Amino acid sequence: MERYKGLERLLSELEEFLFILDKENLSSAAVLKKSIVSEILQLFIKSNSSCDEEYIYMNKVLETDKKEAQGKQGKAQVLDPPAKETLTNGTAGQHLAPPQKSLPDLPPPKIITEKLPVSKCDSPEGYYEEAEPYNASFNDDGEAVSSSYESYDEDESNKSKSAMQQHQWPSTEASIELMKDAMICAFLWRKKWLGQWAKQLCVVKDTRLMCYKTSKDHNPQLDVNLIGCSVSYKEKQVRRKEHKLKITPTNTDVIVLGMQSKEQAEQWLKVIQDISGLQSDPLCDSSVITADGQRQIHPKAEGTDRHSGASESGSSTDGHPETPEIKEVKKKVTSGLKLSNLMNLGRKKSTSMESPDKALETSNYLNVLINSQWKSRYCCIKDGQLHFYQDRNKTKNAAQPVSLIGCDIIPQPTQDHLYSFRILQNGEELATLEAKSSEDMGHWLGLLLLESGSRSDPEDFTYDYVDADRVSCIVSAAKNSYFLMQRKYCEPNTYIDAPRGQRYQQDDLYDDVDMSDIQGDEPKSEEKGEAEDKMYLDLIPTRSFLHSVGIKSLCQALGSPGPERVSGKKDNEESERGTLSCREQDSSGQVTEETKQVTEDPPQQTSPGTPIIGPSVSASPRLEKSNKERVKATNHVAIETLLGKNRTEAEIKRFTEEKEKLEKEREEIRVQLAQLRKERREMKETVTNCPDKGLLTDLEDKLRLKEEQCKERESYRVDLELKLVEVKENLRKAELGPATLGTSVEPAHLDTTAPSIKSCSPTHAPECSPVTATVGSPVNSAVALKSRPQPIVTTGKVLQKAKEWEKKGAS
């Protein structure tokens, strides 16, 4: 008898002691030890309840002492499974006992209000009864789930005030480790993706919103960065008012939180708006928020963000280190998340289908180390510099921009900051940055490596404290962003056809023509009555003189034709190259011109074997004298020089020689690479089988040197391949001839429509009279254009681009 009384008194004193400890601000070790003592106490009572229960209740009925009745009441509460929350989540404090699978945790506010008014005359069975709060049900994991959410309106003052006091921060929950440095926290209703409402502990700490299933959990179910998000307050008029906050983060789905009152909603709205930096309108409308917005489309991305949340929240300006339990991340994949992926396959397009320019982002939020403190800043790459801004609006610079040219980008992961990297210039640290995930870190590494001009390979970096999967993700994202950025700068363009950082070398769109010809024809070229008749040089598609017969002799014989008045429509249609067409600028667009037959004095005697091309152009009498002088002055100048044909031939020759040289050098490098790899393989085998530790160090140094040589030659081979592709492209352009205006013509058509070349013997060269052409009717330029063959539409270089892309990817 005395034994049981002593045990009962011990239990009562121990319970009171635990209540006192709940009111104190304990360290983590003390909280852990207190939870262990409480767990042992519960297990002891549970194991002995079967034999002592009847006797204890008999004592409760017969004993009239007030103190012992209160002690027995405390023991009955310990024995009552639902009353466990009184010890752990009571009004006096919070107890961090591990959750029992067989004893689901009830929401704390529902138990507090009902367990306090207990009289000593109640029947023993009353201690085992507990009404379910509201109409909530409990699932397997002990989480309160309700199919509908109804807040208490302001007219129900008592319940509203009590609920706000129990849920609104600050509360007794603030003594928990999770609540330290929190801006605001409360038990709120969160809408799940199937429309269900679950009451969870929501905490806003630093710049993140974290939702916990219970106050004992260290791993949040939801961890979202609030920077840049939009938030709106919605009030729905139903049977009772519903106060909801709709939060739309930048990289995850919509989050809907249910509040107890309008004041609580406005308080949360203000806190989230201050963090996000976007003052969204507190719109109150009656629209129903669908459950589609809450479907978890990216469980994997959420896992990575949740993992990186430890580093980001740990890198706050407060400098408080996070506990290992918070940094630890558990991968949980539920059937609901898998089902959401299947339901949303057709809703969201893959990012690979988007254009590279759209998918390639050069600005985003990063953590920046400023004065030994991590701060979130909006970083943007522009004109070879990395700019830092306070927010996305770019209204205020947070720091001086960093020039990236010539810098070294080196990852430096630490135990607290896995995705941090540094920007160095000549060994001096310019900036230290931290990404939010492995994919984001790889993306920024690729961008910074390309902008800095560094030839470092992301695979060669050392990633401490990062596992193999995340390293693979970082390397893959870095290469992807690097090649996308390189493609953005190096993709061929009509107007900008040069890689980034190189001087733009454009093909001359117009051939070089001496100004002396034009200046000689300008004076006295027209009369007052003939002012309306103007002459234009009809630039029609021509092939390079490489494809013609008698090129050299033709180049030596012909001079430079100037803009002259043309007569001869039929001859113009027969020989479209080498003739001039007249166009009269009137409203009808037709060309009307009088037929004029003018004989021109024969040109100077040409060199032996020089052919004369026909038909020649007959000029008006007024231009005859000036034409004679011009022909004499420019007879020694080849037409190819004036029209840029010699330049084309020289370019073809130069590019051909350069291509052959590069191909030969490529083969030599391949042979060298094969030899180096063979030597490296043999050296690795030697190092593996070497028993002598003294020789092992020398062999390892030689092996490291051999690997560096392999990497250097491989990098040189990649540059050589890219240069060879560029030379081949330039050679192809040169073989097509100079750029022309208008339409393009098939080569076969040029062969058939080439003008006949009339050769004169050396002795009879002076007697060769020029051919004069006559015109039967005016020339309609529109009809002449229609009679020409249809242009060849050159579209698509898919195979060529694919091969180039494969070469870049293989390197």
UniProtKB/Swiss-Prot annotation:
Basic and acidic residues biased stretches: 299-309, 521-532, 566-577, 622-631
Region (Disordered): 67-110, 132-168, 294-326, 500-532, 558-631
SMART domains for the chain: PH (SM00233)
Annotated ranges, domain PH: 181-277, 359-453
PANTHER family the record matches: ACTIN FILAMENT-ASSOCIATED PROTEIN 1 FAMILY MEMBER, ACTIN FILAMENT-ASSOCIATED PROTEIN 1-LIKE 2
Protein's job: May play a role in a signaling cascade by enhancing the kinase activity of src. Contributes to src-regulated transcription activation.
Protein name (record): Actin filament-associated protein 1-like 2
Originating organism: Xenopus laevis (African clawed frog)
Name of the coding gene: afap1l2
